[in-house]
Regions:
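Catalytic cores of the polymerase beta-like nucleotidyltransferase superfamily
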Residues: 1-246
């Protein structure tokens, strides 16, 4: 799989422009772009980590090179976005957490989202068996603590299932259930965004069934507490909650 993804990276015009511009600066692709390439999906939002150079300066310089719009998304966490002229492609640029690539990757949500690719050395960095999960079509988290630190990830697990159709282990559903009360901590806008992504997937029913098992569904949409009380009737073999999900 990795050789096929390498070929996609090397044939991607924008990625190669970034590589050429970076020259001797260590720059890594990370997260969604690699996952999407593995899944054969288009990607218009590329995340890159800049090592040993200030991400803000790099982002400003790259914006000039690409004639892109520079947006400081989060100055505190040093996250900067470039919007390309086509208004379709985006580049998010940051430095690694605590100046450590390993610490940055280990704080991400899913193992399949924690694969990095070193543009200068042309090699993958897969510390958490992300490629294995992609091959096995499994969704696994890096750590339980990461869910507690950012509770939106409790919902993102199922958003990615809706998009990929990958399986979620029962133990992971139990872990999510233990922390379900945290899901309302993130801003409503962030929750709504994840729900929109979930409902746009090809495997929404599968994801909703597990979202219900985890208890998250009733936490974010309390109306389903009443829906679950309605039993099957002569017109449908499932309770109302099952019928609603179908």
């Amino acid at each position: 799989m990795s050789s096929q993804i390498t070929n996609k990276i090397k044939s991607d015009k924008l990625i190669q422009q970034i590589k050429t511009f970076a020259k001797n600066t260590k720059v890594l692709l990370v997260g969604g772009v690699i996952r999407d390439f593995c899944l054969g999906k288009e990607n218009h939002d590329k995340d890159i980590i800049v090592v040993e150079k200030d991400a803000k300066i790099f982002a400003q310089e790259l914006a000039k090179e690409l004639d892109a719009t520079y947006i400081p998304l989060d100055e505190i966490n040093h996250i900067y976005r470039l919007v390309l002229r086509d208004k379709i492609n985006f580049i998010d640029i940051t430095n690694p957490i605590e100046n450590s690539l390993q610490k940055d990757l280990e704080r991400r949500d899913l193992r399949m989202n924690a694969i990095a690719y070193d543009l200068q050395d042309d090699k993958f960095i897969d510390l958490f068996s992300g490629f294995k999960d992609l091959n096995d079509e499994k969704i696994n988290i890096i750590s339980e603590q990461n869910l507690v630190d950012d509770p939106l990830r409790l919902l993102r697990i199922f958003r990615f299932q809706a998009i990929t159709g990958f399986d979620i282990d029962e133990n992971l559903i139990k872990i999510v259930k233990q922390h379900k009360n945290l899901i309302n901590k993130p801003a409503k806008e962030r929750i709504n965004y994840e729900l929109m992504k979930l409902f746009s997937g090809n495997y929404t029913v599968k994801a909703l069934e597990n979202l219900d098992k985890s208890g998250i569904l009733c936490e974010i949409l309390p109306i389903f507490n009443d829906v679950k009380k309605v039993p099957p009737n002569s017109h449908h073999h499932l309770p109302l909650i099952g019928h609603s999900i179908e």
